[in-house]
Amino acid sequence: MSKPKQGSVRERGDTISQEKVIEIKNLTKMYGNHVGVKDLNLSVYRGEIMGFLGPNGAGKTTTIRSCLALIAKTAGEITIFGLDSHRDSVAIRKKTGYLPGDFGLIPSVKVRFYLKYLLSLSGCDSTKKMVSLAERLQLDLDRKTNELSKGNKLKVGIVQSLMAGEDLIILDEPSGLDPLMQQEYYRILHEEKKRGKTIFMSSHNLAEVESVCDRVAIIRNGQLVVVEDIRVLQEKTGKVLEVEFRDTVNIDEFKFEGVGSIRQDNGRLVLTIHENLDSVIKAVSNHQILNMNLKTYSLEQLFLKYYAGGETDERGGA
């Protein structure tokens, strides 16, 4: 697989710089003969929200745990804040908030005391922020941990990660909130971004990544498929034109710049069009048409193509 190009950093005001907070070079992690991740290269910049998207088992958690030295990598280099992820892991963790996918709670402890205990381990003590976040996420600080629903347990993990994340917040599959709380969570993440914090979040939820992230890295079978600005991917979605002609046509007539693929399917001509739609329509109109249908090629379909191992669009930088 060719090495994916790093997409342009999305600019929103002046909060995103070219300073690399996370830099991963040729990361490989083997579990015996099984590949967790292979030759992974990725940079995450200060002040951006980077989505790390892929199906379950693609290598997202392995990458995150390698970054935080929770597992030993097989090969490669990882630096965070310019520090070695393994040698300087203690210093890195003091500036990093982390929500693991398997976040657990000590039973029968009030949420308030549990959060204060967790934060004391990282040297963070901000009762005011804890109370504010709990109010916004509708988390009862005086409930005991064993009395919490799954969604409220997740809120505890979210609050501790946001409080501990002095400069960097790493989130491993932070899903499970109800829709209203999810939107409030997104607003909080954007506020943290505006303060200059960097957020690296893994997900298998396309809607989540599209809603909150500046860029996205898509991983499949332990290897990166594409790293790109969300807006660029949205622009790539394009159209799918299906045309049934009365007579046989030469497909070379429709090979315009901006036409991604052309194929014939049961007597129909099927074109994926990223730009130059007018030129294609004019060429089509030179023939007798029996039926024609123009559909939008959605972002979801694009991601499914990457997931399924379909041919990668060269214009996307994969």
Region locations from a protein language model:
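C-terminal coupling/interaction segments
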Residues: 2-13, 273-318
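ABC transporter nucleotide-binding domains
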Residues: 19-22, 29-201, 206-220, 226
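ABC transporter nucleotide-binding domain
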Residues: 186-272
